[in-house]
Curated annotation (Swiss-Prot):
It is a peripheral membrane protein. It is an enzyme of class 2 (transferase). Pfam families: Mab-21, Mab-21_C. The record marks D140, V141, D157, A158, D319, I320 as: Cleavage. This is Cyclic GMP-AMP synthase. GTP binds at T211, D319, R376, L377, S378, F379, S380, H381, I382, E383.
Length: 522
């Protein structure tokens, strides 16, 4: 058995547990919906903390042909696996604080306490791998196998590979000084732009909405990328769905008084996303030329992107997105989404759905081009709320005894995709994948494993493998439901081609079978 893999999943008790179970390598039965949540009541679920990893013990995959040009460093054939350190002063990766006094940039949580390392595979009795599989070539991709359901892991005393994962998380910790400096620079530019936008009648009510990985406390690697959303409350609007997409809409005003400053952006009855974004971009471009104490330039517009991207001091990238704020009821397409009833409770779900929703000027795909007048639903503020209050217990992660590994798993998943994108950046195979795909899959895994004990920090290796297994399943089945809009498939063929999904599947499978050598690159 590969040292990174967990043991085979245990079957649920006969007390009525209905969570689907299958091997990631050899699923039996009909394909499962990758985002289907267990339908059993809480009493019928497996006991808290009973997990089951993705594959059967000792399962192997067919070797792929080596590609010497793309080969990452792996252990030499016949080399013995190194023992994991017996004990070390491991510290939980923390989110660094922001610049003092920055109103718009909230300081992340303080550093978390140390975690104990898992023992070596020799101590656990696991069989260590001695022969790494050769890395797959750029287009050496398999045919998709049978899909598997999201596994429920079986807890073990020592998670395989946990020591390496904690070392990776340690590497991903952000420097307090670096994050404070970067956050301070971003805040200065953002404040300057907000003041200027408020002087324009169309954007007079604009405000800052703190969203993105910095505010979710899951930022990794370096504080060189920030997402900023400028929200603008709009009067009563009417949404007209575009081409049964469930996520893209035309925006109309129910009433349009003559004094409405947004009337200048109307195309007939429709609020033109392209016109409004063009004016937004023009104001920002003019204003950054007046910022004297900081070097700021605007990057070229990306096709279909709703963001205005700025580069500060040649090293900090800031995506600024305009968002319309609506305090109306959420659209009907979201009715079956946000399935957190068994995780965070039905009460929390009801409270979250009472919050506003947002619309960003994201162009819908239309053939080989884009429909430039559409707006896309956005719930990034709800995502932040969930990640910052992620425990079934309200005290989860508030003290040393109740720490979970949810955010650590998300950071590792984001880093895995980030590293693979860096490795293949010249080949463009992975350009259409983003951290949002990883975060969406992670939310679905949280839904299917709602108990805090199912994310025990001692089971980091198993929990991470669970997330990897689910993401692979979504790639194979070409189905990843938007967490808020179930009928909107983020992995549909018109958004991401099949070949790219097969390529990413092959790369992730190789990484998992060889203890993730990509974590040691770059």
């Amino acid at each position: 058995m590969q040292p990174w893999h967990g043991k085979a999943m245990q079957r649920a008790s006969e007390a009525g547990a209905t969570a689907p179970k299958a091997s990631a390598r050899n699923a039996r039965g009909a394909p499962m919906d990758p985002t289907e949540s267990p339908a059993a009541p809480e009493a019928a679920l497996p006991k808290a903390g009973k997990f089951g990893p993705a594959r059967k013990s000792g399962s192997r995959q067919k070797k792929s042909a080596p590609d010497t040009q793309e080969r990452p460093p792996v252990r030499a054939t016949g080399a013995r696996a190194k023992k994991a350190p017996q004990r070390a002063q491991d510290t939980q990766p923390s989110d660094a604080t922001s610049a003092p006094g920055a109103e718009g940039l909230e300081p992340p949580a303080a550093r978390e306490p140390a975690l104990s390392r898992a023992g070596s595979c020799r101590q656990r009795g696991a069989r260590c791998s001695t022969k790494p599989r050769p890395p797959p070539g750029p287009w050496d991709v398999p045919s998709p196998g049978l899909p598997v359901s999201a596994p429920i892991l079986v807890r073990r005393d020592a998670a395989p590979g946990a020591s390496k994962l904690r070392a990776v998380l340690e590497k991903l910790k952000l420097s307090r000084d670096d994050i404070s400096t970067a956050a301070g620079m971003v805040k200065g530019v953002v404040d300057h732009l907000l003041l200027r936008l408020k002087c324009d009648s169309a954007f007079r009510g604009v405000g800052l909405l703190n969203t993105g990985s910095y505010y979710e406390h899951v930022k990794i690697s370096a504080p060189n990328e920030f997402d900023v959303m400028f929200k603008l409350e709009v009067p009563r609007i009417q949404l007209e769905e575009y081409s049964n997409t469930r996520a893209y809409y035309f925006v109309k005003f129910k009433r349009n008084p003559k004094e409405n400053p947004l009337s200048q952006f109307l195309e007939g009855e429709i609020l033109s996303a392209s016109k409004m974004l063009s004016k937004f971009r023009k104001i920002i471009k003019e204003e950054i030329n007046d910022i004297k104490d900081t070097d700021v330039i605007m990057k070229r517009k990306r096709g279909g992107s709703p963001a205005v991207t700025l580069l500060i001091s040649e090293k900090i990238s800031v995506d600024i997105t305009l968002a319309l704020e609506s305090k109306s009821s959420w659209p009907a397409s979201t009715q079956e989404g946000l399935r957190i009833q068994n995780w965070l409770s039905a009460k929390v779900r009801k409270q979250l759905r009472l919050k506003p929703f947002y619309l960003v000027p994201k162009h819908a795909k239309e053939g080989n081009g884009f429909q430039e007048e559409t707006w896309r639903l956005s719930f990034s503020h709800i995502e932040k709320e969930i990640l910052n209050n992620h425990g079934k217990s309200k005290t989860c992660c508030e003290n040393k005894e109740e720490k979970c590994c949810r955010k650590d798993c998300l950071k590792l998943m984001k880093y895995l995709l980030e590293q693979l994108k860096e490795r293949f950046k010249d080949k463009k195979h992975l350009d259409k994948f983003s951290s949002y795909h990883v975060k969406t899959a992670f939310f679905h895994v949280c839904t299917q494993n709602p108990q805090d004990s199912q994310w025990d920090r001692k089971d980091l290796g198993l929990c991470f493998d669970n997330c990897v297994t689910y993401f692979l399943q979504c790639l194979r089945t070409e189905k990843l439901e938007n967490y808020f809009i179930p009928e909107f498939n983020l992995f549909s063929s018109n958004l991401i081609d099949k070949r790219s999904k097969e390529f990413l599947t092959k790369q992730i499978e190789y990484e998992r079978n060889n203890e993730f050598p990509v974590f040691d690159e770059f």
